[in-house]
Amino acid sequence: MPRVLVVDDTASIRFLIRTNMELAGFDVDEAVDGADCLKFLRAAEVLPDVITVDVMMPRLDGISTVAAIRADPRMQHIAIVMVTTQGHPADIQRATTAGVDAYLTKPFDPDLLVLTVRDVIGRSDIRRESS
């Protein structure tokens, strides 16, 4: 069963994403911010297939979190979907430069999120096989 790590400081958003991912057949873990995410990933025996991450969070923002994940050889293959209220083209460019695989703005359609997550997992699997 594919595994997703939901990283957002808003409990209601984590709940919404968790619920829809579980209904779609995913195992779900949660982190409340970027620092919590990195702590979880470093301790995990089994890494998630995909991470959904917000941008604006306390302690460590989403862009810095993505950059840290991409810099770590053990984690750099994980697919990342940014889910945020920031939809300006400059925000999307910063996220893409940091290494996100997909970018969705809030409010988001839960079905589109599930579809996007499945898509980036497929692309991540192809990257992993070719490396």
Annotate each language-model stretch with its function.
Residues 57:
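Receiver (REC) domain active-site loop signature in two-component systems and cognate sites
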Residues 15-23:
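Charged docking surfaces used in two-component/phosphorelay signaling
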Residues 30-50:
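Acidic, metal-coordinating helix/loop segments flanking the phosphotransfer/catalytic sites
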Residues 86-87:
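Short, conserved "switch-loop" micro-motifs in signal-transduction and mechanochemical regulators
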